[in-house]
UniProtKB/Swiss-Prot annotation:
The family this protein is said to belong to: Belongs to the oligoribonuclease family.
Subcellular location: Cytoplasm
Name of the gene encoding the protein in the UniProt record: orn
Lineage: Bacteria, Bacillati, Actinomycetota, Actinomycetes, Micrococcales
Record-annotated Exonuclease domain positions: 10-172
Matching Pfam families: RNase_T
Major enzyme class: hydrolase
Keyword tags: Cytoplasm, Exonuclease, Hydrolase, Nuclease
PANTHER family per the UniProt record, alphabetical: OLIGORIBONUCLEASE, MITOCHONDRIAL
Function statement: 3'-to-5' exoribonuclease specific for small oligoribonucleotides.
Protein name according to UniProt: Oligoribonuclease
UniProt-listed Enzyme Commission number(s): 3.1.15.-
């Protein structure tokens, strides 16, 4: 069986949402950075605050509303752009580096992918079906190498998309150096 090679660049994504259900919750913020295979960012990335519907904002539970209030994100929503404009900005950024087949990467990335699929289908269409989920590597380290897990960088992003993307890249770099060191 011949399998086409995947691009070496990684598309790091983090989304902040009104909740975790893409059928009723909406995007509030999306950040993307493309890195090379060595996890070096190609540039500063793109960060977009999205203007959600009043219904989605009103339906946020207290925990999520408090989280976004503390992070300062709620205060920025009045300057947010429609999701269609956010999608165009994110797609333009990604395709500047990768035309198609980018490997979506991040922490607990499956949830982000559900929201990208629902609200940014043009972005989803240019991503590969494979993903790199740093949280899966973290879970392996917890079980197989707790001493390495205990040295992992602490997260401080405070539920802001760009800070979370940068922390995910740093976390994978740590695990690559300390955990994924086997030789063939």
């Amino acid at each position: 069986m011949c399998v086409a090679p995947t691009p070496s660049h990684l598309v790091w994504v983090d989304c902040e949402m009104t909740g975790l259900n893409p059928e009723r919750d909406e995007l509030l913020e999306v950040a993307v950075i493309v890195t090379d295979k060595d996890l070096l960012p190609l540039d500063e990335g793109v960060n977009v605050v999205v203007s959600p519907s009043s219904e989605a904002l009103g339906a946020m539970d207290n925990y999520v509303a408090r989280m976004h209030r503390v992070s300062g994100l709620l205060d920025e929503l009045s300057n947010g752009v429609p999701v269609s404009e956010a999608q165009a900005m994110v797609k333009e950024y990604i395709t500047k580096h990768i035309k198609t087949g980018g490997i979506m990467s991040g922490n607990s990335i499956a949830t982000d992918r559900l929201f990208i699929t629902r609200y940014m289908p043009d972005v989803h269409a240019i991503l590969h079906y494979r993903m790199i989920d740093v949280s899966s590597i973290k879970e392996l380290a917890v079980r197989w190498a707790p001493e390495i897990y205990s040295g992992a960088p602490n997260k401080k992003g405070g539920h802001r998309a760009m800070a979370d993307v940068l922390e995910s890249i740093a976390e994978l770099a740590y695990y690559r150096e300390h955990f994924l060191t086997g030789t063939a």
